[in-house]
Structure formats: C-alpha cells, structure tokens
C-alpha cells in the first residue's frame, strides 16, 4: 500500500524519468552463494571421520563453507590434511577429537595439517568448537620414552591469509600451534588453550605457539595453560605481534632457542599487554654460546611491554649459555647479537624462588647487548628487587648486581 507521501514521491520520480535507461547487471557482478557442506559423522571412535571430512573439502573447499554442527563429535583417527581448501571457511561448532593411539601418531609431524593454503578461516562462531588432541597417552608414554616423537596439533606451513579463531584447543600430544615455511599473514585470536594431565606425568613440550619462518603473524586475546613456552619466536620469525594474552604455568614469552647449529635471526617482535601467571619466566631470550658447531644468533627490534607478573620465577631473563654448562661457556662465551631489545612496563611479584632476584640478564661476553629496561617495578615477595647482570650496557635503565647466569 502506498501512503500519500510515498505516492507523491513515486509520481515525482515517474515524471522525472519518463525514459529510464536499462541497467544490465553483469553475471560476474552477482555474488554466488557459498557452497555449504556438513560432513557425515560416523558416530563411533572406531570409525575414522577423516575420509568424510576430506570428501566435504573436495565438494566445498574451493570458496565454500564446511560446518561441524554444535553437539556433534567427529573422531579423527588419522592426519586431517586441509589440502583443497582455498578461500574456504571451516566452522567448528562441535568437537574434533583425535585418537589417542601412540602407535599411529608416533613420528607424525602434524595432526591437523595446513600446507600451502591461501585463504582459510578455521573458526567457531559460537565459541563452542573444540579441537581435542587427546594427548594423555602421549604424556604417559613420553614420561618413560624420551625418544618418542609426538605430533603438533595444528601445523601451518607456507600459504597466506589464514585465520584461526573462537576455538578451544585442548591436550595436544606436543605443541599446540606451529607456523613456518615462510607463511604470511596469519591471525590467531579468541582462543582458549589448555594442556592438562590426569596422571603424574605432565604435558611436556606443549608450547602454545611456535612461530618460525613467517611474516605478519598476530596472536591476540588468547589464554594458554601449558607446560612449556607460551609463545616461542623461532628462527625466521619476523613482524609478529602478541597482545592481550594470558599464560599460566608456562615458560613465558620466549625468543629462541637460537644458534644451536646455524645462523638464526628473529626480528620485529612486539609482545604487550601480557598476563603471566606462575611461569618459569615472564619473558626472555635464549641463545646458544659460541664453539662446538654452534651458530650465530641475531635478535633485533624486539619489545616486551606491559607485562603483569604473578608468581613467575623471573620477570625477565637473558640466557647466553643455553644448552651448555657454565664451564663450557667460560671457554666459549656467548656471541649473540641483541639489538634494540626493549623491556618496559613490567609490574607484579615473582614467585620468590630466587628471592630477592627478579631478573637475570646474562649477555654473552663476545656478543652485543643493546637492551634497555624502563618502568620495571616487579618485586620479590620479600619486597626487594635485585636484577642480576653480566655484560649489559651502562645505559640499561635499572640498577644491576653482578652474578648473572644461564
């Protein structure tokens, strides 16, 4: 029904456009709906749902959407390779649960593999989606067999424009997320990650993020509970931002380890607005010393800022003798090049394990130690705040006491 005002407007438009031109819409200008596939779940741990998921990727992986509905559980008894996804959207609202078979997974690199894919969103829109690495058997086996090789839960190699968001990741056998192979533009956001053991054997080596050769990686609004580095910047990481992250029980935000056998570079890193709880350190740099086939480590333009330290053993640590004994490093001092390392805005209280020491900066005698610290107010439980230093610059920014190690 046309109301008077609308009728008048309609009449005016009719008079002013007595000979309207036809506007033809190009078929290419019409957005085609995305194909949507929902894999059929087998409904039993004895049925591997990976083939059904691969079939869905074959049908909908090129620009389409693959949905794992809320309330569903998919049992993954083999590696899930997302090859064939290009500009695709994988929406996990149910549970993807990997098998706990230590026989099958032994020696595998990845459980969920993203290799040379350009354009992929792996996400939960509701926050209910879970990727379960089912790692308890691996924790128990590794406790008695240190040679047992465990897979990474989510492994990204090469490719670009990848987003992982809104999910819970739990109990990986080894590392949660790995990025390498010159991958570009990866975003991790709004993730809940926890590795917990129900036996006396801890979930060893469960790094939250291992960021290797890659550029423009962002990690934001993430919580991690684990038993190794919360975030580790490995050789080749460049332009990485970590922000608004909470880490519990970890080894902190770490550069390294670097220089074990080759020339390693980490550069252009920003880690800020971090809550670090009951970790061995809040932030730090780990480099191998010189000699014995070790290489050269270069760490440039790295900023650690606005860290809230709660019960961590150290607030900040530089290790230039990583992987070797103190006596070895007396003969083969560290030679790492540290340039433009900024530590600022650290507050809170350490665990007291090294009370009154709150930071330990052991720069290599044969290296470069361009490090500055400011607004550093972390204290030990005693109320004291000793910073141990060796080979640090006079312009460091905090009062130093000799005797650093590591």
Swiss-Prot record:
Function per UniProt: Pectinolytic enzyme involved in the degradation of xylogalacturonan (xga), a galacturonan backbone heavily substituted with xylose, and which is one important component of the hairy regions of pectin. Activity requires a galacturonic acid backbone substituted with xylose.
Family as reported in the entry's similarity comment: Belongs to the glycosyl hydrolase 28 family.
Protein name: Probable endo-xylogalacturonan hydrolase A
UniProt keyword annotations, A-Z: Carbohydrate metabolism, Cell wall biogenesis/degradation, Glycoprotein, Glycosidase, Hydrolase, Polysaccharide degradation, Repeat, Secreted, Signal
Domain of life the protein comes from: Eukaryota
PANTHER family: ENDO-XYLOGALACTURONAN HYDROLASE A-RELATED, PTHR31736
GO cellular component, one term: extracellular region
Xref: InterPro entries: Glyco_hydro_28, PbH1, Pectin_lyas_fold, Pectin_lyase_fold/virulence
Keyword Heme among UniProt keywords: no
Gene Ontology biological process terms, A to Z: cell wall organization; pectin catabolic process
Location(s), subcellular: Secreted
Main location: secreted
EC number: 3.2.1.-
Active site: 228 (proton donor), 251
Pfam families to which the protein is assigned, alphabetical: Glyco_hydro_28
PbH1 repeat ranges, renumbered to this chain: 183-213, 214-235, 237-257, 299-320
Leader sequence residues: 1-18
GO molecular function: polygalacturonase activity
Annotated glycan sites: 301
Coiled-coil intervals, chain numbering: none
């Amino acid at each position: 029904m046309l109301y008077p005002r609308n009728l008048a407007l309609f009449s005016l438009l009719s008079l002013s456009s007595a000979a309207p031109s036809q506007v033809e819409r190009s078929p290419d200008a019409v957005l085609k709906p995305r194909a949507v596939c929902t894999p059929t779940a087998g409904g039993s741990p004895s049925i591997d749902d990976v083939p059904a998921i691969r079939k869905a990727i074959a049908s909908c992986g090129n620009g389409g959407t693959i949905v794992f509905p809320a309330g569903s559980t998919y049992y993954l008894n083999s590696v899930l390779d997302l090859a064939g996804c290009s500009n695709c959207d994988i929406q996990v609202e149910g549970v993807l649960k990997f098998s706990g078979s230590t026989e099958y997974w032994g020696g595998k690199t990845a459980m969920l593999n993203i290799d040379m894919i350009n354009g992929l969103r792996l996400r939960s829109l509701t926050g209910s989606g879970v990727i379960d690495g089912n790692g308890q058997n691996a924790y128990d086996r590794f406790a008695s067999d240190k040679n047992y090789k465990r897979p990474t839960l989510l492994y990204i190699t090469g490719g670009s424009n990848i987003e992982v968001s809104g999910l819970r990741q739990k109990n990986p056998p080894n590392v949660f997320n790995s990025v390498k192979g010159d991958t570009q533009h990866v975003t991790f956001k709004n993730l809940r990650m926890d590795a917990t053991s129900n036996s006396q054997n801890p979930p060893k080596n469960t790094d939250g993020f291992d960021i290797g050769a890659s550029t423009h990686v962002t990690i934001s609004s993430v919580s991690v509970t684990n038993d190794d580095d919360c975030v580790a910047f490995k050789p080749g990481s460049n332009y990485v931002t970590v922000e608004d992250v909470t880490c519990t029980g970890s080894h902190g935000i770490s550069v390294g380890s670097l220089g074990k056998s080759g020339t390693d570079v980490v550069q252009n890193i920003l880690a800020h607005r971090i809550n670090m709880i009951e970790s061995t350190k809040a932030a730090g740099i780990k480099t191998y010393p010189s000699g014995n086939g070790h290489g050269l480590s270069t760490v440039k333009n790295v900023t650690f800022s606005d860290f809230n330290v709660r019960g961590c053993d150290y607030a900040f640590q530089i290790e230039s003798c990583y992987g070797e004994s103190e006596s070895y490093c007396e003969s083969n001092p560290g030679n790492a090049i540290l340039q433009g390392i900024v530590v600022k805005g650290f507050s809170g209280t350490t665990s007291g394990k090294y009370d009154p020491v709150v930071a330990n900066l052991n720069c290599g005698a044969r290296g470069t130690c361009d490090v500055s610290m400011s607004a550093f107010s972390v204290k030990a439980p005693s109320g004291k705040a000793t910073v141990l230093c060796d080979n640090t610059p006079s312009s460091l920014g905090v009062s130093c006491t000799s005797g650093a190690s590591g």
